[in-house]
């Protein structure tokens, strides 16, 4: 399994299950330029079509395969492809010239939080991408693995929804935990 290409995924939750779970959005990873590109695009297309029938939006997740470089050129192409397939929003990663990726993508972008970072660094990431045009962040590890996840979620929300700088949000976080 370790040497297998993990970009060949299947849709784990069909539309009926998403409806039963009262899902607000469905997400599908896409592996543009990787071995699993065709199957991931097929999964995305089917999910978008099912979501459209029931008014459930689909988020296209730009995954980066092992052999892929995290360049602004790659992210600009991959986000554009996913958006033009019909997703309502795209999840991608921060990169050099990120504001160009946002400008080239016709739907809102949220940014993945990536690996677990210290709280101040995660808030800096959130601030940087929001200030460059991202509409939100998806920071699972950086919130759930924080020693103070509720306060960290509140600090991230301050950046995304209230215009706090990373420094202001970190100060807010520190005040909340002490």
What do these predicted regions represent?
Residues 175-178:
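Extended terminal accessory/targeting regions
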Residues 149:
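Short acidic, glycine/serine/threonine-rich loops at helix termini
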Residues 141-145:
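A short, acidic, flexible beta-alpha connecting loop/helix-capping segment that sits on the rim
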Residues 1-111, 116-139, 154, 158, ...:
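Alpha/beta enzyme core
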């Amino acid at each position: 399994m370790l040497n297998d290409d993990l970009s060949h995924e299947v849709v784990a939750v069909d539309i009926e299950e998403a409806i039963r779970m009262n899902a607000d959005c469905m997400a599908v990873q896409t592996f543009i330029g990787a071995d699993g590109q065709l199957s991931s695009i097929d999964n995305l297309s089917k999910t978008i079509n099912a979501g459209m029938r029931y008014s459930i939006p689909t988020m296209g997740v730009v995954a980066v395969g092992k052999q892929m470089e995290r360049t602004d050129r790659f992210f600009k192409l991959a986000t554009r492809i996913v958006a033009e397939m019909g997703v309502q929003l795209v999840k991608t990663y921060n990169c050099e010239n990120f504001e160009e990726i946002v400008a080239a993508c016709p739907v809102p972008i949220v940014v993945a939080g990536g690996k677990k970072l210290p709280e101040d660094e995660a808030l800096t990431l959130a601030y940087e991408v929001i200030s460059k045009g991202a509409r939100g962040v998806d920071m699972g590890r950086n919130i759930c693995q924080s020693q103070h996840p509720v306060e960290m979620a509140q600090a991230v929300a301050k950046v995304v929804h209230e215009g706090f700088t990373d420094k202001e949000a970190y100060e807010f976080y520190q005040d909340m935990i002490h």
